[in-house]
Every structure is written in structure tokens, then in C-alpha cells.
């Protein structure tokens, strides 16, 4: 996958390209990240990249000419088929379904805003999609862009040690993930659930699914409303709810 990044601070993306899963993906040639800074497309000695908004008000906007020139340079490098994405609080909220959708692209250009944002006409003429990572404000689009790259890269074949890892992540099937345990078997008088030590793969799968359903019901119940549960899932959720309510009564 090829990703172009438009940013005033491209060095921030070393967190993606030099470390962890995404760093290995870059090293192994599975992920290619290139950068264009609007500062490199300025023509004044101060390398100005911000400008005052029409109508007044606090803050500045990114200057149109350097930003557009940077986007055009990235488009030329990408060739045909690259989607241009602006990271913005006004965009569609990124979720696992959206990540899967974005992962089908072989080429993306991510535009990271700064200051109070970018000119609306640039959005209309240069941007294909707007995406947000949540209903809050950050200082720029770099962190959302890194979040998007990390989440999408997990779906590139060969990036994860076991491709099933991406399929079993939280939200992969619309549910939160189940609890996980590793050694030691007993930690401060707390045991690993016996079923996980049984070697019975059918029962382990059933337990994990029930815990996933139950955890979603407890922590993110709104997610269940958008799902069409199977008969098995409905039974397991009801079973979890009975067990949970029984435990609460004991306390």
C-alpha cells in the first residue's frame, strides 16, 4: 500500500514508519509512506503557510497555494487511483467498518490540517473524503492520520504475524474483544478461566464469543443495536446476562 502525507510536520510520522508493526511493514516493503510539506512550496523568505480568514475571527487558516501545490505534487507521484483524504472533525467518524473500507485502497493521500483548518474551496476541489477519529479537537491532523495508517495497515496481507489477528480484533465483527490471559496461571489469587486451559477448542470459542457479547453489552450497548445477532449469539448473550445479574445479587 502507498500512502502520501501532506503535513507541516512530517517528522512526526517516524512513530509510524520506524516502530512496531507499521515500522516492520515499511521495512519489508509492504507499506510505503511518502511526505510533502506545504513549506516546501512557498516562495517567500519566511516560508509562510498560514493566512487570515475572510470575515475575521480568531486563528489562521492554512494558506491555499502551498497546500494545493503539495497536494498536486502528491497526486503526480501517486498516479491514477489515489483517494485524497482530509483528516477533519467534520468528517465521517472512523470505525472498524470504515477501516475495512479504506483498506481496499492501494493508494491514499492524507491531508493533515493545522491552525483553524483549510479553505472550503480546497476541500471541494481537491478532497475526495473527510474522516474524523472522534468528537474532539486536536492541534492538527497528524495524529488522526497516524491512527488511520496504523489501523488500515493491519489489513495489508503479511503485515501481522497471523492474519487472523486483524479479523479477531475488537470491533472486527462489531463487538468488543473478549478478555485475554497469559502466564502465570494464578496472579494475586486470580485464576485463568478453566475453559482456556481445557484444550477444548469448541468450548474456548464459545466462551470467547459469550465474553465478547457480554463485554459489549456492559460497555458499549449501542453497538449491539446495529447488529443482527445469530441465534447462538442471542443465547450466549442471555446466558452472560443471567450470570452477570446473579453475580451482582451476591454482592
Curated annotation (Swiss-Prot):
Pfam families: tRNA_m1G_MT. Transmembrane segments: none annotated. It is found in: Cytoplasm. GO terms for cellular component: cytosol. It is an enzyme of class 2 (transferase). GO terms for molecular function: tRNA (guanine(37)-N1)-methyltransferase activity. The keyword Transferase applies. Keywords: Cytoplasm, Methyltransferase, S-adenosyl-L-methionine, Transferase, tRNA processing. Belongs to the RNA methyltransferase TrmD family. HAMAP family: TrmD. Specifically methylates guanosine-37 in various tRNAs. This is tRNA (guanine-N(1)-)-methyltransferase. It comes from Pectobacterium atrosepticum (strain SCRI 1043 / ATCC BAA-672) (Erwinia carotovora subsp. atroseptica). The lineage of its organism: Bacteria, Pseudomonadati, Pseudomonadota, Gammaproteobacteria, Enterobacterales.
